[in-house]
Amino acid sequence: MKNAMLALSRFMSILGGLVLSFLILLTCVSIAGRLLNGLFHSDFMTGIAPGFSRWMIDIGVGPVTGDFELVEAGCAFAIFAFIPLCQMTAGHASVDVFVSFLSERTNSFLRMVTEVIFAVVLVVIAVQLASGMFDKIENRETSFLIAYPVWWAYALSLFGAIAAAIVGVYMAVVRVYEFFSRSIIIPEGTEAGH
């Protein structure tokens, strides 16, 4: 089970990384297009190369239409895509100043409670995201600029949220078992399986 959860976590992280890479490329293209569009509209370019400037504007050199909408949807997915690996490797930011002096047993209890709370929160988020997605489907809401159905972004995020919830519940079960059996199944702070 641990290997399956780790494989799911890694797959989601790779997918999230690919989506973020696409969004970076999209943003760069959009910024370059916006800059070039401004240049071709400038008095300088229209003065020295009016035909070329008009041609570049006419072929559509400019920002990517709906880039903000796509970045918004993609970032939401990417966040959910990275959560499973953070859960598996205890990679979330934490401050241990207040717990470093506590016993290992107390820290194990705190890890268990934290994982259970995190699992509950991830399940609630996934359920609420599904509810919101069904509302968007029913209302046929579309994005403003490129008019794609908003539920597509919700569905993409829901895919990531479900994966995060599955791994979150798994980690909660693992930490509960570890606490009561006084054993370590998945070491904290290192990638499982290494």
What do the predicted segments below correspond to?
Residues 1-194:
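Alpha-helical transmembrane segments and membrane-interface helix-loop junctions
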